[in-house]
Structures are given as structure tokens and as C-alpha cells.
């Protein structure tokens, strides 16, 4: 293959081909004749060489292109390319799906013979041969030189950025051309010099490789190229890419591939320079096997490289890592499992062997190789043996397979010491330690540990990873499919690869293995995992995933994806330090969605660490999946055991055990059940209360433990356990609560935890409640765990959970509110205070909200309460408080309220509350007591059944039954009312607790009580079930209660984990500094203009005139001027004035009232100026004066902006003209002529418009939309999407409590038939049932005749079923 450098640039293409023919010729000459090219090559080579020779390699020294060269460049660089060539290029691009460089190169190579080029591309040119790996960085020097080189205008970029190259690639500079084009020559020479410098620099060490030939010498020699060509591969002649441009040809340097092949950065890396010299033109060498192997492994390379070069690894090179990456190899597992490592390796090995000198010669594991590395370690060994140094280190690796792999990698990477020391050792060490900790990981770790020194290089690490991954894979395959790994995205996998290369992976591997260890040493495993995780798990996980990816199916996917990447990774690997190992790889979207996944550490807690946090590994998925899943699984096993034990315990005390379960689920299980139980039972209430309030994070005590454990293990186990434990409620509550907890745990835990937990907790709580005792109490603990164990019940949650968060802060307030609420009871006040109560619940409010939401429905009975519940704040707190009223629950009025409270409570308390309510005082007391748990617990406080019932929630321990009991009690006490409320509650909250308890309560009563803990737990199960069901069932705890308003109207879906008011209070606090506080609803958020008010002025002033239409480019800004001051706008850009959302926008009850809109934060303060806000942009007076006002003149005059041009005159003049519309009048005749508006017109004179802002066609802006053309922007303030105001869901608040004959009835539908006699109320307590009475009068005609008869009005009498709701005085027809 001719090694010619493919350069014939564009037009020169043909020549280039010729050049190709002559190695010596410098293709650079481009078509002009390779002779020139040669001479150029020689000259350039010499120049470059000389420069290169100069070790100092002063760029300055680099010769500028000679006039001759420039001329040649000009000649060869035909900017206008033969259209046919473009067509051909496009055609080839389409046919071969190769990169433009490759296609252009091929065409050039093939003298623009389309068919030949296609064959060349497909048959000969390896995939990615031309992938541009280049350090953009080099361009700096290149640019400098380029700048120096006049002829290179195009190439001024020096490297001719790939982009540039591509652009200039016009055929003239088709990539090949660029390379070849003499023009490129100039730049190339520069670049070459630069590269040489870089290479020489890095390469200085390599100079020996240069074969003693100084690059400069080589360059100097025309032969240089020739050598490069001939020697090219071996010959340092390859000499830098510069030489490379020619020499690249060495590898077929013509094959741009070589040049491109090596990432330019590679070239730049100089190390590659050595590579050049040493092998295959090092660059290419480095970059691809292809150079080295290109001839014998082209097919393989093509496969490998197809994607390998697709990524712009060049970006890595952008890092200005100086130094040779040559040695660092990252072997990423690739899909080519099919290729036997041996084959690839052997091929590679052969090449390597052929060029043993370049131990560093990149031999990357072929894509398939990684998998097979272990298996075919022997081959690897062989190949690695060819690689001199590396072999030994691998030897240290414990596994023979590993050894080969490692050796292979080591040999390949033969990592430069720095890399070795940097990434691998630490990584490996970590891995080793981790592995050691991992236990299972130990195997990998042992080999890792053995290897850390050995693998110093990233490559080693990668190899290690691979090996580990394989082992891991086996382990995982045995232990668990690594779903998460499957989820890794290519990016992630690559990321992992890089991590692996950087040594992160080794640590991670152990982590993976840890799961096995985990099972063995659950605690250790967790800690290890946690620790490791904290340290490396997360990335490790990725790394694992990456590594295991190989092992795991995910790995496979990765591999397939990565397969191509192998080279890239290898070449690209930036020095570990360059790019943060943990760079910015974000977890997959799933992860992003889960705050919990962020490895944010609040306090000492690592949320992110516990994958477990999310029982759903899927979400954790890529990042955590391995750990998460394994943990989960183990936790499951673990849990199973624990659970089993606990279950045994359960028998003893369901609640405790449940709690334990919940805890177990939490993953506490590992902790002694007894602890958990203890903590749960004894500690739960107090602890939870305490925890929620005082020790949210520490959450010491059994609960605390549960909390943490749950947090830690909960993800997996919790979910598993808690989930199952609480199943119904448990799921959402546990899961969420736990998860939430874990997510929220520390974080949300409070803020949201309470909230969420509240709501979820309620649910969880419900679950917990459901889990009730266990969950609620214990589970609750678990759940509460986060929010507040207690919170398990919403109540507690509210009280506690909320408390937990807010409660801590707000609890008191909550209490206060609650008290108020209690006082108010159901009162909306409570509610609103509920809000505050919520506040107390803070989240609670959300929780309440959730609960409330649920509650609302449920709470139909007590509107206020319901509402309150909605606010829930009262709900929880209130609830308790309400509950107090609730005491009334008995069915007294209080009952309603209580019910409401329940609703609120429902969330946690609610049932308790209800129950508590049952015992009004008890309830309140309960609340106190409940407080511990939560208000719910308060319920506990409630003596007797109430207490029990409440107790259940609260105590859980006391008796699960309690909670249910409570509900039951409530029902019992209240009887129907309670039941109804409970039902409602259930319905609403689904509060699961409360409803569960409530609903269940009725049911549960016996159950809850009867079951006592069991029931609760289970019962909570039942109530939970009910409640849980309620939670599930009611609103579906997760769901927003039907009636409840969203906290944010936006949030229609499952309640968010945390309430999402438009602004959280914190945000508001932050916002307010910038945001003027409440303003008139529609007031602009920013000061209008000095003009102030005029609506026209308003927007317009602020904006420059409605330039928006033409996005006034102000000067530098293309975006429409915003409501930013002109100066600002120019810089800041502008946006339409933010108008508040129209009132129709519905803010949920919790949401800020619309009046409290946050204007767009005045980030850019509008500059109120004496002149218009626009300041210089717009003459201040102009608007006020009139669009045309003279003031404009002045202003514009003053304002340099306007002064610019016709505009200035037109604008200025406009003012003179004073008729804005015809600004042009004064402006210039031209203005008029140009447009009726005059140039000023936006549309008419875009140019001017852009230059200056003038009124939009001088017409006053419409309305106060600042930008005439742009409708008033919606305010930047994030207000939810505009939601037409939905009718508020039925809210208890809205209706006075429905007076129901039977409290059981959720609703009474009165069906009127004929006369009152027909009214039927369906008394079935179990469910809302409406009995419709057929209304057809027996004598419809008669009825018609009897127009007077009320029941016989023409309308109803003839309807089959007319249902008349007396309460609402509504009639409706039912089928």
C-alpha cells in the first residue's frame, strides 16, 4: 500500500495520489505536484525537522510558510471544489458511512475514482483510521505557527481544527486534502513542527526510538517522508504527525488514517511520537492497532474502530495533558467476545512482537479480548510477553488468567510510571482493600492487591477491571444478574472505562464482589459497601458495571458499545489527573430522577451511597445497580433471614417484629431484630419522636438504628423487607418512606422525609401503620425512619415525620397550629395553619398534603379537618390536635373533625388521630403521646381503644392493633362516624393509616387491636392494608387524593416525594432578596422604565423598543432584548418581560397565592434610569415622549448604541420625526424608502434593527407586553404550567361537613323519587353506595300535567333515575 500521505489536497487530489505513489513526495504539495510537495515536505520537514531538531522546539522558530509554499497552498487549496467531488464525497459518505475525512482521503487516494475510493474505504481503510484524535490544544501552538504562516489562513487553526480541517476539507482540503494540501502543508508543517515539538518533547525520551534519527533529520530528509512511509511505521520518520502528515503515511500515512489514526493529540502526545518512531508511527500505533496491525487486522480493527473513533476522544486530548498517553491503555471490554482474545491478541501480539521495541505499542485488548482475557490469559501472556515490561507486573497478579490479562494490559499499557502510580495503584489499592473488605471481592482484590503496583497504569486497572468484571460477572451471574450494569449507557460504560483506567475500578470491583462478602458479612458488607460505596462504590459501581458489564449482560451491552471504544479509550485515556475520574458522569436519567441517588452527603450520611436506598435497582440502575441489587438481594436474603427471625419475633410482637421487619426491610434486619424491636417498640415512639425532632439524622435508638439502617440498607432490604413488610402501605410507605427516607433520609427525611414520608410515610406510615405497628411504629420507625419513625403514621410523621423535618423545626409550630387546629380542630385554620401545621409538618404539609390530599377526600366529613388534613399540617399535628377534636370523633362533631384530623392524621396520625380522636383528649394526649409517634401516637396517648388505636399507630408497639384499633376504636367509639371518617380517611389518604386504620380500623378494630401489633402491622397491614390499602387504596397512598389539591398544581402525579410548592419557603427566602416581594399580580416584575407606567412604555421601555421582534441583537446579543436594561440586555440577553401567570393559574392551596408571584428574580436589575430603563439603548424620553419623541434624538444621540448608523440617525431622527411609525421621516429618506417604517422597522431593516434597537416599526408596543413581537414572556419565575383553574376537588373546606344521617356513609346521596318517601339513603357502611330510585312516575303524563308538582316537574318525572342530593341540593341522573 502506498504509504503516501494522503494529502493531495483537494484539487491536488490526483497528485496526491501520485504523491501517494511517491513516498518521498510530500503529499502536502497537494495536487501541485508532489514534487513541490516533496520539496515542501523536505522543506517543511527540514524546517519542521530543524525546529523539531531544536529540542527547545521554539514555536517561534518554526518557519513561516514560504511564499512558494503559500503560493502552492493557494494553488492547491482551491476553495472552490469541483462540484463533482462534493457529490462524490456525499455519495461515498452515504454509501460507506465513513467519516468525511476518510471519504475525502479515499477519494484523494483513489484519484477521485468513486468506485475505487469506495473499495478502498470498504476494503482497505480501517474503520476510524481517520478518526480525528487530536488535541485541540495543539492548535494553540499550531495556531501560533499557523498564524505565523501566512499561507495557511485556512489552517490558521494550526491543527486545522478537525473542524477546520473538515471544513477546509473542501475537497481541496479534503481531509486527505487538508493533510495533503500544500496549504495544509503549511499548517501541517506548523502543526508538524508543533507536533514534533510536542512529540520531540515527550519524545525526547523517545528520540532513541526515533531510531536515532532526529525527527528533524527525518523531516529534513525528503526521505524522511519516505522513511516515514517506508520506515514510517518504524521510522521515527513518522515523526510527528507533522511528519505524520506526510509520514503518517508511514502507516499508509497516506492513509490519513495514520495521521488521523493517531489522535492528533496522540501525535501531540509526543509519546506517540516515540510511537511514531517506534512503531507504526506511534500515533497510529497508539491510536490504533490499525497502524501496527492495520494490514493484518484491518477487518478486526475496522470492527473495533468502527465506533472506536466515533467518539471524539479527541476531547480527552483536549485536556492539555502533556506527555505520552502512549503507554496508558484502557482495555474496555467489548462485544467482540467472538473474536478470540487469542486471535486478536495474537494478531496484535504478532504486531507487537514484530515491533517488540514498542512495548508500549498500543496493543489494546481487542474488543472481544477483555472477556476472553481471563480465559485466554495464556494468549495474553504471550502477547504481553512480547510487551516487555508489562509482563512482569501482571505476573504478580494472582490469577493466571488475570496475569495474562494484566500482563497483557500491563504490557500494552506498559503504563508510564506516572499513570501507574496515579490511577492504578490507588485504584488498585483501593480495589484491593475494597476487595479484601469485599470478601467475595477478595478474589479480585487479591489479584488486584497483588497487582496494584503492577498495574500502575490505567490500562492495568482496566485489565484488572476486566478480570474482576469477569470474575464479578461470574459471581454476579451466579449471584445476580446485574441489571443495573445492563443499564449503563455507553457513556457511562466509557466513563467507567476511564475510571477503570484510572484505577477507580479496581476498588469498585471488590465492591461488586462485596455482595458475596456482603452476604457473608452483611454488616461488613454494608459498611464496606457503604464505605466503598461512599468512596468508590458509586463510581465503582459504574466501574463494576463497566467491568462486570463484561461479566454481566450489561457488560455485554457495554462491550458491544464499547467494543469500538477500545481503542479510543486506550488512546484517549487522558492522564488520570487530567479529567476527574469522577468527572461529571451523571448517573443515568433514572438516577437523576432520584435525588437519593445523588451522592450528596448530608451530615455524615451518605445518601447516594446506599443504592439500597432505592429498592428499585432499576432506578439506581446503572450506578448502583450492582451494589444496590446485590445488596438488595442479599438484604433480601439477609432480610429474609432477619425477617424470618423477625417474623418469628413477629409472632412474639408483631409490631416489634414488623418494625423490625420494616427495619429489616430497612436493612436493619441485619441489626439485631431485638435491637430493632427494642428500638422500635420502646424507642420507636420516643426515638422516633426524638429522632424526628432532635435526632433526625442520628436517629439513634432502635428507631434511629432503624433509621440509619433502613437508610443504609433500606434501599434494598428496606424495600424488599419493608416493602413486603408493609406490603400495601409498606410498599409505598416503606418503599417511599424508606426509600424516601433513604432519599430523604437525612435530607428529605426531614424536609421531605417528613413531608414525603409523611405522605408516603403516612402511606409508608400507612404502610408503617399498616406495617403499622411495625411499619408505623417499627416500620413507621423504619419509615419514620426517615421522616420520623413515628411518622410512620402520617401523623407522627406529620407531627413527627413532618416533625422529623419540619417537625423538628416545625413540630412545635405544628403543635401550635395543631393546638390551634385542635382548637380549630378541623378548622381550615388548622389547615392553613395546617399549612404551617404543614409547616410543622412542613413537609408534613405535604405529608399532610398527601395525607390531606387523601384526607381531603376522606375527610369529606370534616371539611375543615379535611381541608386541614389537606393541609395535613394540621393533619398530622392537627390531626392530633384535631384528633383532640377528633376525640369528638366519637361521632360527635368532633368526629367529623376528628375524622378530618384523621384524614390529616390519616396520613399518619389520622387513623390514630381518629382513634385518638376517639379519645379526644386521649387523642390530644395521644397526640402528645402520639407525638412521639406522631399525633398518631398521640392517638396512642388516647387511652382505651383509642389509645390503642392511636397507640397502634403511635406505639405500633403498643399494639398494632392500636392503630387499627385506634381507627377501630374510633369507629367503635365514634362508631359509624369514626368508621365513616376512617373510611373517608381511608379513602382519602388511603391514608392507609388512618384510613387503613380508620377504614381498617373499623375492620381492623378487632384486627388491629385483635391483631394487635400483628394486625396493625399486618393490619396496619390491615389498616395499613386497609390503610395501606387505603394508602394504596385510598388515594392510593402514592396518589394524590382525589379531591386534594396538589400542593403544586403541577404535581398531578403521585405526590412528589416532597411537596413542591412553587417555591419552597427556603427558596422564597432566597428568592426574595432578589425578588421584590409581593407585587400586584400583573405588575411587571421588573421596574418598567422610568417611563414607568405607560403600558406601552412599560414593556417597551424596558425592552428596547419591541425589538424583541427582531431580537434586537443589541450589539452582541442576538436574543431579544429582555426586560433587561439595555446594557444588561446586550450582555445578558433579554427575555420577554415576565408576566405573572394569569390569575386563572390555579395555585394549589399550599401553593403561594398567585398574588405572591415571584417576579422574575431581578437578576439583572432593571436599571431604572433617568432615561428609560433601557438606558442607553433607548432614549429614555422616547417612549414617554412618544415613540417618535425628540427625546429619542437626544437619547439616541447620547446613546451611542443608536448612534451607530442610519439607525442612529433614523432612530435619533425618529425622535425628531417624532412619529415613531415613520421613524424614517426624520431619520433619512432612505429610512422611508427602505421601509415604510423606515429602517427602524424591525422587519424591514433587520440589519439596522439588529444594530440598533428602535421601536418596533415605531408602533407603540401592545399592552404591557414588553416585547411587542414577543408575547409577554411568561415570567421566568417557574410557575407551573398554566393550569386552567380546575374546579377545586371537593374539599371538606368547601362544603360544610356533610351532615350525614349515617356517619358510615361516605356520602349520602339522596335519591328523590316521587316524593320524599322515595328518598333512599344507602346505609351501607362499608362503602359509599348510592341507591337510585327510579323516578319515573307511574303516570308520567300526569306528572307532566302536574307541572306544579315539585317532584313531578316535567324534567325529573320522566327520567329513569334522578338522584337528588339533598345536601348539595343537586339533582343528577344516574343510569
From Swiss-Prot:
<feature type="compositionally biased region" description="Gly residues">
    <location>
        <begin position="228"/>
        <end position="282"/>
    </location>
</feature>
<keyword id="KW-0085">Behavior</keyword>
<feature type="region of interest" description="Disordered">
    <location>
        <begin position="613"/>
        <end position="646"/>
    </location>
</feature>
<feature type="modified residue" description="Phosphoserine">
    <location>
        <position position="672"/>
    </location>
</feature>
<feature type="region of interest" description="Disordered">
    <location>
        <begin position="1203"/>
        <end position="1234"/>
    </location>
</feature>
<feature type="compositionally biased region" description="Low complexity">
    <location>
        <begin position="869"/>
        <end position="882"/>
    </location>
</feature>
<feature type="region of interest" description="Disordered">
    <location>
        <begin position="750"/>
        <end position="801"/>
    </location>
</feature>
<dbReference type="GO" id="GO:0000932">
    <property type="term" value="C:P-body"/>
</dbReference>
<dbReference type="Pfam" id="PF12478">
    <property type="entry name" value="UBAP2-Lig"/>
</dbReference>
<dbReference type="GO" id="GO:0035332">
    <property type="term" value="P:positive regulation of hippo signaling"/>
</dbReference>
<dbReference type="InterPro" id="IPR022166">
    <property type="entry name" value="UBAP2/Lig"/>
</dbReference>
<dbReference type="InterPro" id="IPR051833">
    <property type="entry name" value="TC-DDR_regulator"/>
</dbReference>
<feature type="compositionally biased region" description="Gly residues">
    <location>
        <begin position="768"/>
        <end position="781"/>
    </location>
</feature>
<feature type="modified residue" description="Phosphoserine">
    <location>
        <position position="674"/>
    </location>
</feature>
<dbReference type="GO" id="GO:0045571">
    <property type="term" value="P:negative regulation of imaginal disc growth"/>
</dbReference>
<feature type="modified residue" description="Phosphothreonine">
    <location>
        <position position="673"/>
    </location>
</feature>
<feature type="compositionally biased region" description="Gly residues">
    <location>
        <begin position="426"/>
        <end position="441"/>
    </location>
</feature>
<feature type="compositionally biased region" description="Low complexity">
    <location>
        <begin position="750"/>
        <end position="767"/>
    </location>
</feature>
<feature type="compositionally biased region" description="Gly residues">
    <location>
        <begin position="1009"/>
        <end position="1036"/>
    </location>
</feature>
<dbReference type="GO" id="GO:0060179">
    <property type="term" value="P:male mating behavior"/>
</dbReference>
<dbReference type="GO" id="GO:0046426">
    <property type="term" value="P:negative regulation of receptor signaling pathway via JAK-STAT"/>
</dbReference>
<dbReference type="GO" id="GO:0008069">
    <property type="term" value="P:dorsal/ventral axis specification, ovarian follicular epithelium"/>
</dbReference>
<protein>
    <recommendedName>
        <fullName>Protein lingerer</fullName>
    </recommendedName>
</protein>
<feature type="region of interest" description="Disordered">
    <location>
        <begin position="869"/>
        <end position="894"/>
    </location>
</feature>
<feature type="compositionally biased region" description="Polar residues">
    <location>
        <begin position="374"/>
        <end position="387"/>
    </location>
</feature>
<dbReference type="GO" id="GO:0005737">
    <property type="term" value="C:cytoplasm"/>
</dbReference>
<feature type="region of interest" description="Disordered">
    <location>
        <begin position="142"/>
        <end position="286"/>
    </location>
</feature>
<dbReference type="GO" id="GO:0010468">
    <property type="term" value="P:regulation of gene expression"/>
</dbReference>
<dbReference type="InterPro" id="IPR009060">
    <property type="entry name" value="UBA-like_sf"/>
</dbReference>
<feature type="domain" description="UBA">
    <location>
        <begin position="84"/>
        <end position="124"/>
    </location>
</feature>
<dbReference type="GO" id="GO:0007620">
    <property type="term" value="P:copulation"/>
</dbReference>
<feature type="compositionally biased region" description="Low complexity">
    <location>
        <begin position="629"/>
        <end position="646"/>
    </location>
</feature>
<feature type="compositionally biased region" description="Polar residues">
    <location>
        <begin position="1265"/>
        <end position="1277"/>
    </location>
</feature>
<feature type="region of interest" description="Disordered">
    <location>
        <begin position="1"/>
        <end position="69"/>
    </location>
</feature>
<feature type="modified residue" description="Phosphoserine">
    <location>
        <position position="324"/>
    </location>
</feature>
<feature type="region of interest" description="Disordered">
    <location>
        <begin position="1251"/>
        <end position="1277"/>
    </location>
</feature>
<feature type="compositionally biased region" description="Low complexity">
    <location>
        <begin position="987"/>
        <end position="1008"/>
    </location>
</feature>
<feature type="compositionally biased region" description="Basic and acidic residues">
    <location>
        <begin position="53"/>
        <end position="62"/>
    </location>
</feature>
<feature type="compositionally biased region" description="Low complexity">
    <location>
        <begin position="173"/>
        <end position="184"/>
    </location>
</feature>
<keyword id="KW-0597">Phosphoprotein</keyword>
<keyword id="KW-0963">Cytoplasm</keyword>
<feature type="compositionally biased region" description="Low complexity">
    <location>
        <begin position="142"/>
        <end position="161"/>
    </location>
</feature>
Amino acid at each position: 500500500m502506498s504509504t503516501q500521505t494522503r494529502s493531495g489536497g483537494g484539487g491536488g487530489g490526483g497528485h496526491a495520489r501520485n504523491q501517494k505513489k511517491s513516498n518521498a513526495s510530500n503529499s502536502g504539495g497537494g495536487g501541485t505536484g508532489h514534487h513541490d510537495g516533496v520539496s515542501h515536505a523536505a522543506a517543511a520537514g527540514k524546517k519542521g525537522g530543524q525546529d523539531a531538531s531544536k529540542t527547545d522546539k521554539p514555536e517561534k522558530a518554526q518557519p513561516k510558510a514560504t511564499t512558494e509554499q503559500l503560493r502552492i497552498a493557494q494553488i492547491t487549496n482551491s476553495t472552490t471544489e469541483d462540484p463533482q467531488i462534493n457529490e462524490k464525497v456525499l455519495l461515498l459518505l452515504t454509501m460507506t458511512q465513513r467519516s468525511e475525512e476518510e471519504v475525502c482521503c479515499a477519494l484523494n487516494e483513489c484519484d477521485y475514482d468513486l468506485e475505487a475510493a469506495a473499495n478502498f474505504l470498504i476494503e482497505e481503510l480501517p474503520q476510524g483510521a481517520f478518526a480525528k484524535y487530536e488535541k485541540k490544544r495543539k492548535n494553540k501552538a499550531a495556531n501560533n505557527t499557523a498564524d505565523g504562516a501566512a499561507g495557511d489562513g485556512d489552517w490558521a487553526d494550526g491543527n486545522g481544527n478537525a473542524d477546520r480541517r473538515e471544513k477546509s476539507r473542501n475537497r481541496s482540503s479534503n481531509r486527505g486534502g487538508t493533510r495533503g494540501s500544500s496549504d495544509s502543508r503549511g499548517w501541517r508543517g506548523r502543526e508538524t513542527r508543533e507536533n514534533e515539538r510536542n512529540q520531540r518533547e515527550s519524545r525526547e525520551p523517545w528520540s532513541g526510538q526515533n531510531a536515532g534519527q532526529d525527527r528533524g533529520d527525518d523531516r529534513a530528509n525528503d526521505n524522511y517522508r519516505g522513511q516515514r512511509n517506508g520506515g514510517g511505521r518504524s521510522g521515527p520518520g513518522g515523526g510527528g504527525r507533522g511528519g505524520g502528515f506526510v509520514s503518517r503515511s508511514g502507516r499508509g500515512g497516506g492513509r490519513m488514517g495514520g495521521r488521523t489514526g493517531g489522535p492528533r493529540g496522540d501525535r501531540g502526545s509526543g509519546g506517540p511520537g516515540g510511537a511514531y518512531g517506534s512503531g507504526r508511527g506511534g500515533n497510529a500505533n497508539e491510536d490504533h492497532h490499525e497502524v501496527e496491525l492495520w494490514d493484518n487486522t484491518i477487518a478486526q480493527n475496522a470492527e473495533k474502530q468502527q465506533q472506536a473513533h466515533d467518539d471524539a476522544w479527541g476531547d480527552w486530548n483536549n485536556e492539555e495533558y502533556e506527555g505520552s498517553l502512549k503507554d496508558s491503555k484502557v482495555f474496555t471490554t467489548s462485544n467482540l467476545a467472538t473474536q478470540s482474545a487469542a486471535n486478536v491478541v495474537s494478531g496484535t501480539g504478532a504486531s507487537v512482537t514484530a515491533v517488540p521495541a514498542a512495548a508500549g505499542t498500543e496493543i489494546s485488548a481487542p474488543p472481544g479480548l477483555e472477556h476472553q482475557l481471563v480465559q485466554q490469559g495464556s494468549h495474553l501472556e504471550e502477547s504481553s510477553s512480547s510487551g516487555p515490561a508489562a509482563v512482569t507486573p501482571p505476573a504478580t497478579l494472582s490469577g493466571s488468567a488475570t496475569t495474562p490479562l494484566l500482563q497483557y494490559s500491563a504490557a500494552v499499557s506498559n503504563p508510564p510510571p506516572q499513570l501507574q502510580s496515579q490511577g492504578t495503584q490507588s485504584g488498585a489499592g483501593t480495589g484491593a482493600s475494597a476487595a479484601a473488605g469485599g470478601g467475595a471481592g477478595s478474589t479480585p482484590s487479591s489479584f488486584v492487591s497483588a497487582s496494584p503496583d503492577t498495574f500502575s497504569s490505567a490500562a492495568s486497572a482496566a485489565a484488572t477491571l476486566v478480570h474482576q468484571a469477569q470474575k464479578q460477572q461470574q459471581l454476579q451471574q451466579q449471584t445476580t444478574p446485574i441489571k443495573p450494569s445492563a443499564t449503563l449507557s455507553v457513556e457511562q460504560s466509557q466513563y467507567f472505562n476511564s475510571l477503570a483506567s484510572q484505577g477507580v475500578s479496581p476498588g469498585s470491583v471488590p465492591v461488586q464482589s462485596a455482595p458475596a462478602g456482603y452476604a457473608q458479612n452483611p454488616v461488613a458488607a454494608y459498611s464496606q459497601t457503604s464505605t466503598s460505596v461512599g468512596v468508590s462504590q458509586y463510581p465503582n459501581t459504574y466501574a463494576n458495571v463497566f467491568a462486570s458489564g463484561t461479566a454481566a449482560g450489561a457488560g455485554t451491552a457495554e462491550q458491544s458499545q464499547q467494543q469500538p471504544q477500545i481503542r479510543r479509550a486506550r488512546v484517549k485515556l487522558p492522564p488520570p489527573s487530567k479529567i476527574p475520574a469522577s468527572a461529571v458522569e451523571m448517573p443515568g436519567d433514572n438516577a437523576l430522577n432520584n435525588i437519593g441517588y445523588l451522592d450528596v452527603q448530608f451530615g455524615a450520611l451518605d445518601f447516594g451511597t446506599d443504592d439500597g436506598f432505592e429498592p428499585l435497582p432499576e432506578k439506581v440502575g446503572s450506578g448502583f445497580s450492582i451494589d444496590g441489587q446485590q445488596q438488595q438481594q442479599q438484604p433480601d436474603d439477609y432480610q429474609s433471614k432477619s425477617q424470618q427471625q423477625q417474623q418469628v419475633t413477629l409472632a412474639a410482637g408483631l409490631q416489634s417484629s414488623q418494625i423490625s421487619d420494616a427495619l429489616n426491610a430497612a436493612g436493619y434486619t441485619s441489626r439485631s431484630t431485638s435491637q430493632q424491636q427494642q428500638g422500635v417498640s420502646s424507642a420507636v415512639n420516643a426515638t422516633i419522636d426524638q429522632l424526628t425532632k432532635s435526632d433526625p439524622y442520628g436517629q439513634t435508638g432502635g428507631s434511629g438504628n432503624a433509621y440509619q439502617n433502613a437508610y443504609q440498607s433500606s434501599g434494598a432490604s428496606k424495600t424488599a423487607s419493608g416493602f413486603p413488610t408493609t406490603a400495601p402501605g409498606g410498599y409505598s410507605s416503606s418503599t417511599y418512606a424508606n426509600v424516601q427516607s433513604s432519599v430523604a433520609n437525612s435530607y428529605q427525611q426531614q424536609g421531605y422525609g417528613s413531608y414525603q414520608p409523611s405522605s408516603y410515610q403516612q402511606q409508608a406510615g400507612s404502610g408503617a401503620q399498616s406495617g403499622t405497628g411495625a411499619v408505623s411504629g417499627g416500620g413507621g420507625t423504619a419509615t419514620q425512619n426517615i421522616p420520623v419513625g413515628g411518622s410512620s403514621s402520617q401523623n407522627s410523621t406529620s407531627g413527627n415525620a413532618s416533625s422529623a423535618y419540619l417537625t423538628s423545626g416545625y413540630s412545635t409550630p405544628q403543635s401550635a397550629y395543631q393546638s390551634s387546629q385542635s382548637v380549630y380542630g378541623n378548622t381550615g385554620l388548622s389547615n392553613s395553619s395546617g399549612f404551617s401545621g404543614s409547616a410543622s409538618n412542613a413537609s408534613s404539609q405535604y405529608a399532610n398534603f398527601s395525607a390531606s390530599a387523601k384526607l381531603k377526600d376522606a375527610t369529606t366529613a370534616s371539611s375543615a379537618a379535611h381541608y386541614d388534613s389537606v393541609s395535613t399540617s394540621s393533619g398530622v399535628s392537627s390531626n392530633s390536635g384535631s384528633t383532640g377534636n377528633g376525640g369528638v370523633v366519637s361521632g360527635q362533631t368532633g368526629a367529623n373533625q376528628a375524622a378530618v384530623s384523621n384524614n390529616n392524621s390519616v396520613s399518619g396520625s389520622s387513623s390514630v388521630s381518629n382513634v385518638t380522636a376517639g379519645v379526644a383528649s386521649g387523642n390530644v394526649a395521644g397526640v402528645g403521646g402520639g407525638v412521639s409517634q406522631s399525633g398518631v401516637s398521640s392517638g396512642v396517648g388516647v387511652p382505651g381503644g383509642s389509645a390503642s388505636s392511636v397507640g397502634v399507630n403511635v406505639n405500633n408497639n403498643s399494639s398494632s392493633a392500636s392503630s387499627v384499633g385506634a381507627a377501630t376504636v374510633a369507629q367503635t367509639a365514634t362508631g359509624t362516624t369514626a368508621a365513616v371518617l376512617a373510611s373517608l380517611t381511608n379513602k382519602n389518604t388511603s391514608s392507609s393509616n388512618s384510613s387503613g386504620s380508620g377504614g381498617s380500623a373499623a375492620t381492623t378494630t378487632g384486627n388491629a387491636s385483635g391483631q394487635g401489633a400483628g394486625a396493625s402491622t399486618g393490619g396496619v397491614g390491615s389498616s395499613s392494608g386497609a390503610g395501606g390499602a387505603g394508602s394504596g387504596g385510598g388515594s392510593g397512598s402514592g396518589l394524590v387524593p382525589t379531591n386534594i389539591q396538589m400542593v403544586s398544581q403541577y404535581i398531578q402525579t403521585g405526590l412528589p416525594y416532597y411537596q413542591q410548592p412553587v417555591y419552597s419557603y427556603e427558596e422564597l427566602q432566597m428568592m426574595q432578596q432578589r425578588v421584590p416581594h409581593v407585587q400586584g399580580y400583573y405588575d411587571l416584575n421588573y421596574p418598567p422604565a422610568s417611563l414607568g407606567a405607560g403600558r406601552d412604555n412599560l414593556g417597551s421601555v424596558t425592552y428596547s423598543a419591541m425589538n424583541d421582534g427582531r431580537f434586537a441583537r443589541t450589539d452582541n446579543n442576538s436574543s431579544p432584548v429582555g426586560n433587561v436594561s439595555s446594557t444588561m440586555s446586550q450582555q445578558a440577553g433579554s427575555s420577554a418581560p415576565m408576566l405573572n401567570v394569569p390569575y386563572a393559574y390555579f395555585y394549589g392551596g399550599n401553593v403561594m397565592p398567585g398574588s405572591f408571584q415571584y417576579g422574575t428574580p431581578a437578576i439583572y436589575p432593571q436599571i431604572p434610569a433617568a432615561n428609560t430603563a433601557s438606558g442607553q439603548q433607548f432614549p429614555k424620553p422616547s417612549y414617554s415622549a412618544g415613540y417618535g419623541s425628540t427625546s429619542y434624538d437626544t437619547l439616541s444621540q447620547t446613546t451611542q448604541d443608536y448612534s451607530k448608523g442610519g439607525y442612529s440617525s433614523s432612530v435619533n431622527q425618529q425622535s425628531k420625526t417624532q412619529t415613531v411609525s415613520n421613524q424614517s421621516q426624520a431619520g433619512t429618506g432612505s429610512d422611508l424608502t427602505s421601509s415604510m417604517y423606515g429602517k427602524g422597522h424591525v422587519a424591514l431593516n433587520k440589519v439596522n434593527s439588529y444594530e440598533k434597537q428602535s421601536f418596533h416599526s415605531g408602533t407603540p408596543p401592545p399592552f404591557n407586553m414588553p416585547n411587542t413581537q414577543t408575547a409577554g414572556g411568561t415570567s421566568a419565575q417557574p410557575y407551573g404550567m398554566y393550569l386552567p383553574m380546575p374546579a377545586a376537588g371537593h374539599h371538606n373546606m368547601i362544603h360544610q361537613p356533610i351532615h350525614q344521617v349515617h356517619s358510615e356513609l361516605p356520602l349520602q346521596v339522596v335519591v328523590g323519587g316521587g316524593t320524599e318517601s322515595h328518598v333512599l339513603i344507602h346505609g351501607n357502611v362499608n362503602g359509599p353506595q348510592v341507591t337510585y330510585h327510579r323516578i319515573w312516575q307511574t303516570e308520567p303524563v300526569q306528572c307532566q300535567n302536574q307541572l306544579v308538582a315539585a317532584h313531578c316537574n316535567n324534567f325529573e318525572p320522566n327520567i329513569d333515575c334522578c338522584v337528588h342530593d339533598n345536601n348539595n341540593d343537586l339533582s343528577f341522573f344516574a343510569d
